[in-house]
């Protein structure tokens, strides 16, 4: 791979890693490059983000990991996006992610990934943007991953007074919700959203 291709791979990996970020050790293993090469690529990508007005991202180093973030100059537009009401029905991936967070909170994105068996960065961003989920602190130790919890808006959207009102788990040993109860639960949520749109 030439340098430009390496930068493209690096950017893809950082995007996929989301809030968890990537360490130089992870980059050297995945990209099969040296530690120095990883640092050089990170520095070059950071310079490109910082020097170009048409790029909306920056590269941050937090607690030994690197992650992409939006530029502060665009904060006003991002705030507007979050504030724009959205009555769209949640996707199956978002509903599954929301159920995992609701039952296991506080929980990290990586823990949600393990339960679902796929990356959940996109669904979590959607849930945060819709105000159903928020981050509440970080895990102690390496990586300092964000901990996600549901919000009061989540309770309102699902007609719950508290988390105690969630459908009961069929088998506490597995921590998996009863599928029939969950289907009824999410159907009720989707119906309420459809009624709001009418």
From Swiss-Prot:
Keyword Iron: no
SUPFAM superfamilies (alphabetical): Winged helix' DNA-binding domain
Compartments where located: Cytoplasm
UniProt-annotated stretches for the region Disordered: 168-198
UniProt record, GO biological process: cell division; chromosome separation; DNA replication
Pfam family, one: SMC_ScpB
Keyword terms: Cell cycle, Cell division, Chromosome partition, Cytoplasm
Domain of life: Bacteria
Alphabetical list of InterPro entries matching this protein: ScpB_csome_segregation, WH-like_DNA-bd_sf, WH_DNA-bd_sf
Record keyword Amino-acid biosynthesis present: no
Cellular component, GO annotation: cytoplasm
Quaternary structure note: Homodimer. Homodimerization may be required to stabilize the binding of ScpA to the Smc head domains. Component of a cohesin-like complex composed of ScpA, ScpB and the Smc homodimer, in which ScpA and ScpB bind to the head domain of Smc. The presence of the three proteins is required for the association of the complex with DNA.
Function: Participates in chromosomal partition during cell division. May act via the formation of a condensin-like complex containing Smc and ScpA that pull DNA away from mid-cell into both cell halves.
HAMAP family: ScpB
Family of the protein in this entry: Belongs to the ScpB family.
Protein name: Segregation and condensation protein B
UniProt lineage: Bacteria, Bacillati, Bacillota, Bacilli, Bacillales
UniProt gene name: scpB
